[in-house]
Amino acid sequence: MEPITHFLTGACMGRAGLNRKTALATLTLTLAAEAPDLDVLGRLRGSAFGFAHHRGFTHSFLGVPLDAVVVVGFVYLIWLLRGRRVKDPNLPPRWELLFFYACLAGLSHILLDFTNNYGVRPFWPFSEKWYSWDIVFIFDPILFSFLLLGLIVPSLFSLIDKEIGARQRGPRGRVAATMALIAVVLLWTLRDFEHRRAVAALQARTYNGADPARASAYPDLDNP
């Protein structure tokens, strides 16, 4: 997926409740959700090198902990530069938990990239095999909208409450972010159904009088 979708996913994970366990959770999850794409720095050594190593080690199960170390180290540096201040003094950073969260966010990146038609190599360097679900284009406006709304809707309601003088009730941010993540899973379910139906339709056809040896269907922006 494109970077903004990954950032939004990490932010929703934090707002869904993980930020209640430790300070700096949402920041860590947001950065870690996009951290595997640091492999784009390989393009500095040339386009061929960058292409060959994209979605390689940083997108593998073996690379997730290393990605997490980089992110948590960066967040730790920010924390130090800010004088070790956090929003809630009663909720200090729990670095071992932040590392775990960073790993979860890294896995979310692999999962999102697995759903599109480019795929991932999660078992690299032990296997160069690519795996892809082929149900989502690299940018899906509906999925993107779910995640974005899950983050901004609570803020809009808060502004309305302040404008009319109403008292805010309940953890709107947590509910909205959780609903956004659930909506993404439901969208995947629908897209999987549509993908299977498209593949079945292709397999049912004959080509020059012969049955297809293999049929595949790939989403794009105009026809997800």
Model region roles, listed by residue range:
Residues 1-197, 201-213:
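N-terminal membrane-targeting hydrophobic helices
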Residues 216-224:
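Short periplasmic/luminal acceptor-recognition loop of GT-C membrane glycosyltransferases, typified by
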